[in-house]
Amino acid sequence: MASIDIAHERKTAATAGASARPHLAGLTRPLLMDALKAFGLPDNQLRMRAGQIWNGLYNRGFTDFERMTTLSKELRGKLADAFDISRLEIVTEQKSVDGTRKWLLRLPSGIPGVPGPEVETVYIPEEGRGTLCVSSQVGCTLTCTFCHTGTQKLVRNLTAGEIVGQILLARDALGEWPDGGRNSEDRLITNIVMMGMGEPLYNFENVRDALEVVSDGEGLSLSKRRITLSTSGVVPMIERAGEEIGCMLAISLHAVDDETRNRLVPLNKKYPIAELLEACRNYPGVSNARRITFEYVMLKGVNDSLEDAKALVRLLKHIPAKINLIPFNPWPGSPYECSDWEQIEKFADVVNRAGYASPVRTPRGRDIMAACGQLKSETVKARASERFKGEKAAAQPIA
């Protein structure tokens, strides 16, 4: 059996999608204090109460104010009437034979009775670490031709709370809160990668605020060295990302010349390779200790020649970098094939001999469409499938 499908419906307070109460998850500390001040808390209590709520949200994983017993019963009731701290709705959960887990999440729509859009989050367990792949948008505007998400039109940006909410929900599922019976030092989620659905730099403020919450030392406490933001090359935002977010940077490069990259990553027509690499050289904090990762999907007969490998080495000269070679993960209707494994190894050898670390990413979660480049909202997949069936039926001759 390729995968275990544990599809289930779990209705939560978030399911209604129309709560008029503002959600506290994802608010930075200053914004949380602003919300509590507007709520009516006196100035001399703001810092203390914000700290207590912060601890409840991000150290204990509470989804109900009643569990925040450091607050008075009266205050807990008033907070519950004014604010939401529930989780996103899990529509389905799938588990791969390799341990990878994927959650399809429904976001609030803001309209009573109307289901909200959906987004996917993936957890990848490895020896000694666990990586959570987080989405920043529903759909994407970039239409990268090798990426499944790129075939789904942008629906909307995620809020900071919805970005942080993916991490909170994953910690729930993995039993990673103190009450989950797990040693708090034995973390299952050790790394966060902003490599899910969407282009993070086209949702800059929400991604920035979410990662500020995630890296706060008194909450989820993930070091910025364990957080990687991947961009397809939104050049004007790269320097700002280094200054205001300061996490590790990954570039979806995938080609060594503008003609090829224009086809694979149409954004390249706006920000060509030379401009992108110049922005990388100037990325704040880049050094041999904080190298930029260049992602390179291996496409048979497109970008995988040994000449391409040599050109890649020349391009990245004088940039502290590592190169992540990604075997192409197929999806229905994709126009590409994965490079032969022998060719991938030869390509990696050229890069390695030039002095660059070039690990070949092991495909994870392919059987549940959770691997790199395979994410897409399930409702969009279903609509496409129904449309295909309808077109096929219409094409059948009438007896």
UniProtKB/Swiss-Prot annotation:
InterPro entries (UniProt xref): Aldolase_TIM (IPR013785), Methyltransferase_A (IPR040072), RlmN_N (IPR048641), RNA_MTrfase_RlmN (IPR027492), rRNA_lsu_MTrfase_RlmN/Cfr (IPR004383), rSAM (IPR007197)
Residues bound to S-adenosyl-L-methionine: 198-199, 230, 252-254, 329
Disulfide bonds: 133-372
Start and end residues of each Radical SAM core domain: 126-367
Major enzyme class: transferase
The entry's keywords: 4Fe-4S, Cytoplasm, Disulfide bond, Iron, Iron-sulfur, Metal-binding, Methyltransferase, rRNA processing, S-adenosyl-L-methionine, Transferase, tRNA processing
Any GO CC annotation of this UniProt entry: cytoplasm
Compartmental location: Cytoplasm
Other notes: Reaction proceeds by a ping-pong mechanism involving intermediate methylation of a conserved cysteine residue.
Homology family: Belongs to the radical SAM superfamily. RlmN family.
Known function: Specifically methylates position 2 of adenine 2503 in 23S rRNA and position 2 of adenine 37 in tRNAs. m2A2503 modification seems to play a crucial role in the proofreading step occurring at the peptidyl transferase center and thus would serve to optimize ribosomal fidelity.
Name of the protein described by the UniProt record: Dual-specificity RNA methyltransferase RlmN
Organism per entry: Parvibaculum lavamentivorans (strain DS-1 / DSM 13023 / NCIMB 13966)
Lineage: Bacteria, Pseudomonadati, Pseudomonadota, Alphaproteobacteria, Hyphomicrobiales
